[in-house]
């Protein structure tokens, strides 16, 4: 079902499947995300532009891959629901972000998601770059208060 939807609504994927028509080969090479705008269009809004474009960190001197997101709201709902299916409500968790190399660059989907979880999570949630004692204190506080 997903394969058929992508084939119908994603022009790049559609052309790829014309060359490789088997659903067993239903993915695009990572290089395509560097050279093409890979977007699955909403059939009701075929000319919708992305609300967000994330980029990979890439390696020094390389062209980063791009991840075009048409709906910020749908993207947030997707990762939040996936988290909550596995772990329960986001609000009950304290999220501690220790992501130095990611914080120093823009366009990271991981930072975007962690930042959103921090905003939804317990009050002591946050990014703690090189604040090891603060992190240790928060973990100790959370353990004694049974905050995951």
What are these regions (language model features)?
Residues 102-148:
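Conserved adenylate-forming
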Residues 1-91, 96-97, 132-133, 140-144:
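Nucleotide 5′-phosphate-binding alpha/beta core
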């Amino acid at each position: 079902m997903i394969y058929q939807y992508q084939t119908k609504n994603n022009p790049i994927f559609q052309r790829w499947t014309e060359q490789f028509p088997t659903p067993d080969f239903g993915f695009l090479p990572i290089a395509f995300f560097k050279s093409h705008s890979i977007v699955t269009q909403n059939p009701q809004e075929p000319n919708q532009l992305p609300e967000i474009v994330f980029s990979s960190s890439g390696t020094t001197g390389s062209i980063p891959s791009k991840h075009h997101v048409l709906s910020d709201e749908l993207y947030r709902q997707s990762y939040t629901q996936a988290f909550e299916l596995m772990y329960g409500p986001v609000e009950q968790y304290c999220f501690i972000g220790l992501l130095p190399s990611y914080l120093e660059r823009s366009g990271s989907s991981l930072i975007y998601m962690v930042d959103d979880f921090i905003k939804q999570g317990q009050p002591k949630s946050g990014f703690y770059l090189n604040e090891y004692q603060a992190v240790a204190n928060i973990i100790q506080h959370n353990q004694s208060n049974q905050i995951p």
